């Protein structure tokens, strides 16, 4: 009788331990996507848009000059790519 009680106790303790380990790993897995998304969409100072003295493509060019490689459209007042018919 004692041997059967000990084996039942060890079996029960093993099942409880297995349940605790599975629950802990499942709770970590639930937090993992949240951590991953927050790290992906975190705003970093290196990726912020920087202020420039020139206007880029399709930006207004009233006060600002267009960046190199672009010209100010006389009709729309936007910086556009130069074309043979634009001078």
From Swiss-Prot:
Record note on domains: The presence of a 'disulfide through disulfide knot' structurally defines this protein as a knottin.
Pfam families membership: Toxin_12 (PF07740)
Keyword Disulfide bond: yes
Annotated S-S bridges: 54-67, 61-72, 66-79
Signal peptide: 1-24
Organism: Cyriopagopus hainanus (Chinese bird spider)
GO molecular function: ion channel inhibitor activity; toxin activity
A Gene Ontology cellular-component term: extracellular region
Main location: secreted
Keywords: Disulfide bond, Ion channel impairing toxin, Knottin, Secreted, Signal, Toxin
Protein name (database record): U3-theraphotoxin-Hhn1p
Role played: Ion channel inhibitor.
UniProt record similarity statement: Belongs to the neurotoxin 10 (Hwtx-1) family. 51 (Hntx-8) subfamily. Hntx-8 sub-subfamily.
Tissues in which the UniProt entry reports expression: Expressed by the venom gland.
Subcellular location: Secreted
Propeptide residues, chain positions: 25-52
Signal found in the keyword field: yes
